[in-house]
């Protein structure tokens, strides 16, 4: 007789649920609105332009990881650290914007997806790779 696979391991391979995606998008939009208002008083965040690119929410909706990227030149790690310092304030402002049973605990991480995409783009346009991708007359 075969054992049924546990739902936790099955859920881990499926990815986030529709509920998690919807909650993450709500938090991302509300967080962007709070930041746009300019009410954050941290000296490292005043006059700093950045984007909240993605918010991933845990299955129980108690934890949210917010990925941030500076617009233009800037240190993404320093930006994430500055936002972590004011996360209590941001969480309070979010609770006024979005209604959840429990407001998720916020963690901020630098978004490296743009850097990875740029690295892949550079690799694809490098002379070594482009010679492999160009059509050659091998039929002769």
UniProtKB/Swiss-Prot annotation:
Mark out the compositionally biased spans (Basic residues). Answer: 1-13
What's a single GO CC term here? cytosol
Under Gene Ontology molecular function, one entry of this record is: ribosomal small subunit binding
Name the domain of life: Bacteria
Compartments where located = Cytoplasm
Q: What is its main location?
A: cytoplasm
Pfam families given for it? RBFA (PF02033)
Single GO BP term: maturation of SSU-rRNA
Region annotation (Disordered) ranges? 1-22
Q: Kindly state which keywords UniProt assigns to this record, in alphabetical order.
A: Cytoplasm, Ribosome biogenesis
Q: How does it assemble?
A: Monomer. Binds 30S ribosomal subunits, but not 50S ribosomal subunits or 70S ribosomes.
State the family it belongs to: Belongs to the RbfA family.
Q: Which PANTHER family match?
A: RIBOSOME-BINDING FACTOR A, CHLOROPLASTIC-RELATED
Q: What does this protein do?
A: One of several proteins that assist in the late maturation steps of the functional core of the 30S ribosomal subunit. Associates with free 30S ribosomal subunits (but not with 30S subunits that are part of 70S ribosomes or polysomes). Required for efficient processing of 16S rRNA. May interact with the 5'-terminal helix region of 16S rRNA.
The protein here is known as: Ribosome-binding factor A
What is the species listed in this Swiss-Prot or TrEMBL entry?
Parvibaculum lavamentivorans (strain DS-1 / DSM 13023 / NCIMB 13966)
Question: What is this protein's gene name?
Answer: rbfA
């Amino acid at each position: 007789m075969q054992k049924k696979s546990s739902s936790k391991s099955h859920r881990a391979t499926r990815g986030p649920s529709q509920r998690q995606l919807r909650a993450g998008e709500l938090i991302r939009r509300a967080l962007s609105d709070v930041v746009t208002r300019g009410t954050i008083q941290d000296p490292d965040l005043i006059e700093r332009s950045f984007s909240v690119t993605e918010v991933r929410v845990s299955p129980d909706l108690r934890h949210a990881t917010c990925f941030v990227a500076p617009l233009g030149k800037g240190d993404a790690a320093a930006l994430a650290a500055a936002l972590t310092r004011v996360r209590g304030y941001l969480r309070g402002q979010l609770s006024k914007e979005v209604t959840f049973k429990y407001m998720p605990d916020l963690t901020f991480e630098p978004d490296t997806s743009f850097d990875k995409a740029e690295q892949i783009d550079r690799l694809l346009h490098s002379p070594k790779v482009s010679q492999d991708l160009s059509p050659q007359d091998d039929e002769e």
